[in-house]
Amino acid sequence: GVVTLNLSELQPDAAIWCTYKYLNGGPGSVAAMYLHPRWHDLPPGLAGWFGADKSRQFRMEHELVPAIGAGRLQLGTPHVLSLAALRGSLQLIEAAGVERIRQKSLQLTARLRQLLHEHLPDAGFVCATPEADHRRGGHLAIRHPLARQLSLMLRSRGFVPDFREPDLLRIAPSPLYSRFSDCDDLVVEIGRILAAGVEAVDRAQSLVT
């Protein structure tokens, strides 16, 4: 969804990924799997009815005839509403092209890094994400002693970063709909929060935001 990846060239035995982040499937969206053709006859370790050969799935035979490929590892019926949302997102991604999405993603994260450096040089931020494009994914991980407080306060102002222990603020602009002006607005809001004073946060609350 945000990094170009050619599994046919990489030739892994298998690959598993989520669809709720940069594929925009949302919380609870289905997982996905690639299985190399050399393993298409692999017996499923845990068999489910949805892993049966789709042409004979409703014959209700007592002997399971697995589907060909990764489909044989499916267990039950996937969540249809999640699939509907994911289908709409995948159509947009296909129309835009992953290469173009990747380029915009790199530009968005580079802009965020530049804005933080230019506008908040003495605020104590240290970017933990590599600067080189080929080593960077789709988000910036920024170290700051008040990262958790900043995450919570930004959420209350309409921005949705997240926090990871001990001091990481993660910012992930989605290239399909995030604008470069959104990066500007975020950094301005961070500056306002720091200027006003960061509120204390109860450490007994959840440590993930």
Predicted feature descriptions by range:
Residues T19, A52-V65, G69-Q74, T129-H134, ...:
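PLP-dependent class I/II
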Residues N24-G28, Y34-K104, A110, T209:
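Active-site C-terminal subdomain of aminotransferase-like
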Residues G69-G76, I93-R143:
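Conserved small-domain helix->loop->beta segment predominantly found in fold-type I
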Residues V3, N24-V30, P173:
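Short, charged, surface-exposed secondary-structure boundary motifs
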Residues G1-N24:
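Conserved PLP phosphate-binding loop immediately N-terminal to the Schiff-base lysine helix
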Residues R148, M153-T209:
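PLP-dependent enzyme catalytic core of the Aspartate aminotransferase-like
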Residues G1-N6, Y34, R179-D182:
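Active-site core of PLP-dependent enzymes with the aminotransferase class I/II
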